[in-house]
């Protein structure tokens, strides 16, 4: 019988040996060491020969599970970063079009607060490209902060002016000696006529 590869030959030998071990209880044919086998095949062979204790088997399964979990977590982290990047780019595009929804404004403010310390820590960067990006981010943050400050200041001034005008209209604010629309009491026009 001709085999197409060494691995197929090793597999067929292993299956025949297993068959003999199950049929004939006294025979145990050891596989030849010349054939290469995978780590799982070696592990299964050791378990079959009962060289591993229960604790060692649990430990091996625990290590395997930890590796799988690590890969899954890395994949999830990459997906999470990608989704955040997409969300940020969408919000950035809406901001440039001045079409931000309240939820997007809230998310942007949260992102600014979250990354403010990172910008401070990254102030000493040697790479000019990264430095340019950081400077752009700083100017964007300052513009947002100044815009917020300017809007609140304008609102306060408008409210103050409105309140002052309302008080004048109601007559709450009055100056002694002045009558609305008339000259002050005791004012002589004689000095102007001379």
UniProtKB/Swiss-Prot annotation:
One Pfam family named in its UniProt record: RRT14
Keyword Electron transport part of the UniProt annotation: no
Recorded GO CC terms: nucleolus
Major location (coarse): nucleus
Keywords, comma-separated and alphabetical: Nucleus, Transcription, Transcription regulation
InterPro entries hit by this protein: Rrt14
Cell compartment(s), UniProt: Nucleus, Nucleolus
Function: Involved in ribosome biogenesis, probably through modulation of rDNA transcription.
Protein family per UniProt: Belongs to the RRT14 family.
Protein name, as recorded: Regulator of rDNA transcription 14
Organism this protein belongs to: Clavispora lusitaniae (strain ATCC 42720)
